[in-house]
Regions:
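Conserved class I S-adenosyl-L-methionine
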Residues: 1-44, 138-163
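Class I SAM-dependent methyltransferase SAM/SAH-binding core
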Residues: 41, 49-96
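A short acidic, Gly/Pro-enriched loop at the edge of an enzyme's catalytic core
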Residues: 98-105
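Residues lining the SAM
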Residues: 109-111
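A short His-aromatic
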Residues: 114-116
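A short glycine-rich, Lys/Arg-flanked "PGG" loop and its adjoining helix->strand segment in the class I
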Residues: 123-135
């Protein structure tokens, strides 16, 4: 898995991500749908910044990722914040998700579901998350659509500065 190679650099490389805005949006959606507490899963949690924000907001979290190295970084952060007792980390492929119980909701951000592949795999991943969802549960996820490469990326120039 490619993410194993740079797990300890991921946060630095992803440094421009606005986790505060993402958290505010997700927390607002969870509250609006009656999921103000309980167990949530962060599917494709990576190094867990959002996972930890939700833990600190009072949720019991399950962080799921394929990369043991990403989970190791998350584990270190949770230990530093003193929230490890409210966090279960599972190294799993979300196509074969097994949470061993029900959840009130799930989140999956930063285009995790874009990496799943063709529609049958996507449908399977959604079905696995839904299988563990309590009645009335909420699943919040993001996807890139043709809009982004056509309108956002095409309208910008990207480059790298050399040494």
């Amino acid at each position: 898995m490619a993410y194993n190679e740079f797990a300890y650099f991921y946060d630095e490389l992803n440094g421009e991500a606005d986790y505060d805005a993402l958290y505010t949006y997700i927390k607002g959606q969870l509250d609006a749908h009656g999921v103000a507490d309980g167990i949530l899963a962060d599917l494709g949690c990576g190094t867990g910044d959002l996972t930890l924000m939700l833990t600190q907001a009072g949720y019991d979290m399950i962080g799921v990722d394929q990369s043991e190295e990403m989970l190791a970084v998350l584990r270190e952060k949770a230990d530093e914040l003193g929230v490890s007792d409210r966090l279960l980390l599972l190294r799993q492929d979300i196509l074969d998700l097994d949470l061993f119980g029900t959840i009130r909701g799930a989140v999956s951000t930063f285009d995790t579901y874009n990496h799943i592949g063709p529609a049958p795999r996507f449908e399977r991943a959604i079905a696995r998350a839904a299988f563990f969802m309590e009645e009335g549960g909420v699943f919040l996820f993001d996807l890139n659509t043709p809009y982004k490469p056509r309108q956002v990326v095409a309208a910008n120039e990207f480059g790298m500065e050399g040494p």
